[in-house]
Amino acid sequence: VWHCPYFCIFSSKNGQVGGDKYREYLLLKMDGENWESEEKVVNEVLIDHTGDFSGWENWMDKNKQGIDCKLRIRREGKMIFMKTENLGVSVNSISTVKDGTKKLYIALTGDQCAISNTRIFREN
């Protein structure tokens, strides 16, 4: 799916994607497609369609037009929980990092899409 943002959980020495000692733990698109990592991580991704889902063609068309979305991220020790829902597609993932890496980063990017007006909120 083009025009679809995705999230990357990674580590690197300088905190940059592709930086020195870059290691990728998860690459997850907002449509639920994901790539397996060769790193020491276990990724569980659950995709569900809610009553708001009206088909992939409609989903793609609305994404191309632009949508607002929220991503919730929570970390508990070596586990990272991510959850998002948009246009009836619910994506939940749990990544368990098993190599002892403490400093992890999340990048938001996309293929043939524009990402703007990004805001970060901390919930307690």
Regions found by a protein language model. Give the residues of each.
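Secretory/extracellular carbohydrate-interaction modules
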Residues: V1-I47
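Short beta-strand/loop motifs in extracellular/secreted proteins, especially
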Residues: P5, K78-I80, S116
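Ligand-recognition surfaces built from glycine- and aromatic
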Residues: N14-V17, S95-N124
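Short, exposed beta-strand/loop patches in secreted or surface proteins that constitute
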Residues: N34, E38-E39, L71-I73, S95-V97
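Localized edge beta-strand/strand-to-loop motifs within extracellular or lumenal beta-rich domains
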Residues: Q65-F81, E85
